[in-house]
């Protein structure tokens, strides 16, 4: 197997040469004997910053592949304690050892099934970055965490989480209902809801530190809080997401609601169970922002700063509305987002969708602003 060297952050890595596994001029990381995805660099850059704030005493990189995450946590996040690198692929295990030596760091390299290993260890931070759904690994990942431990998890199975595939949604996440127009946020809330349920079985509650959507995946950092009472409190933050199929009115509720829109009387679509609380901790985001200057060498430092600003602004609001969906329901042209936000006043864009916004204004006022902004746009000649 031919290897090539890449630089990511402060890490030097040898990875399988993509040219050896290309097909008709195209390359998919899944075709390589060891998985390395350059499209996940932003995910890893954010994670390096987040782990520097978490400052765990020990780390498990449960599905290490090349070892890039664990290596970067040592070299960039300042992790001083033991780092466990695990992968069941023997080729990966060999490559991880090479990369540890290349970077001059020590770590324990294991070849084990991730679920089996996570039931045997106790660490301060477990990183779960599976190929596809994290659902089969969540219970054991939570059990691997010591008191007040933190779980970092990536999910790429958007079809199941967002409700595009209702059978997958039900099978993997126990979700009932239909896909909503704010599906990107719904998916993140469903993933958090699944984590709550898996943690509660182990008498643990959760505190979300950071959650976001980017490109084609979700990324979450969730702190565990031991105790049955904390587990019960987290379960109280589960509920159902709703959206009127006629007028577009959306809301979340922990109580079971009539399937009739309180605004127009239309049929309510629903999706859940899902987390209905906040999914970002403002103090955690603030500390990440404060530390970002130390990570100015990252190619994504500006993008990370922008993401943190988005998350901070939108955290206090409920689900977002899509301006194109509301305009379609009103049978008007879609207005410019800036005009709409100016009309609403207390409203923000969302990182989930460039067409999305969040507002505390009454729904009737939101609709009036959509109509008014559209009319102004039309009369101004666009």
From Swiss-Prot:
Gene Ontology terms: biological process: tRNA N2-guanine methylation
GO molecular function, one term: tRNA (guanine(26)-N2)-dimethyltransferase activity
Protein EC: 2.1.1.216
Ranges where the Trm1 methyltransferase domain occurs: 4-370
NCBIfam families tied to this protein: PRK04338.1-7
Entry similarity comment: Belongs to the class I-like SAM-binding methyltransferase superfamily. Trm1 family.
PANTHER family reported in the protein's UniProt record: N 2 ,N 2 -DIMETHYLGUANOSINE TRNA METHYLTRANSFERASE, TRNA (GUANINE(26)-N(2))-DIMETHYLTRANSFERASE
Protein name: tRNA (guanine(26)-N(2))-dimethyltransferase
């Amino acid at each position: 197997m031919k290897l090539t060297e890449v630089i990511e952050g402060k890490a030097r890595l040898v990875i399988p040469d993509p040219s050896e596994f290309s097909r008709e001029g195209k390359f998919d990381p899944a075709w390589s004997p060891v998985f390395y995805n350059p499209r996940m660099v932003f995910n890893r850059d954010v994670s390096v910053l987040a782990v520097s704030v978490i400052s765990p005493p020990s780390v498990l990189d449960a599905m290490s592949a090349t070892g890039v995450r664990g290596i970067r946590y040592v070299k960039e996040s300042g992790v001083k304690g033991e780092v466990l690198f695990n992968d069941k692929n023997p080729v990966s295990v060999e490559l991880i050892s090479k990369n540890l030596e290349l970077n001059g760091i020590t770590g324990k390299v294991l070849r084990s099934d991730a679920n089996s290993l996570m039931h045997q260890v106790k660490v301060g931070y477990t990183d779960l970055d599976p190929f596809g759904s994290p659902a089969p690994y969540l219970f054991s990942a939570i059990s691997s965490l010591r008191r007040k431990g933190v779980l970092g998890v990536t999910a790429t199975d958007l079809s199941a989480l967002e409700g595009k595939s209702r059978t997958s949604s039900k099978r993997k996440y126990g979700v009932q209902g239909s896909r909503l127009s704010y599906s990107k946020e719904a998916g993140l809330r469903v993933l958090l809801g699944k984590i709550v349920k898996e943690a509660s079985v182990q008498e643990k509650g959760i505190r979300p530190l950071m959650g976001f959507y980017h490109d084609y995946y979700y990324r979450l950092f969730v702190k565990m809080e031991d105790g049955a009472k904390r587990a019960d409190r987290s379960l109280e933050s589960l509920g159902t997401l709703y959206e009127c199929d006629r007028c577009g009115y959306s809301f979340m509720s922990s109580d079971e609601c009539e399937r009739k829109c309180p605004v127009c009387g239309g049929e309510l679509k629903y999706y859940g169970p899902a987390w209905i609380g906040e999914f970002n901790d403002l103090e955690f985001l603030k500390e990440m922002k404060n530390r970002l200057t130390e990570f100015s060498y990252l190619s994504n430092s500006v993008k990370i700063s922008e993401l943190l600003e988005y998350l901070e602004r939108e955290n206090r609001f409920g689900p977002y509305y899509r301006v194109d969906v509301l305009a379609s329901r009103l049978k008007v042209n879609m207005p410019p987002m800036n005009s709409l936000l100016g009309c609403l006043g207390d409203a923000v864009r969302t990182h989930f969708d460039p067409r999305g916004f969040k507002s505390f204004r009454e729904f009737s006022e939101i609709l009036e602003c959509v109509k008014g902004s559209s009319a102004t746009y039309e009369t101004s000649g666009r």
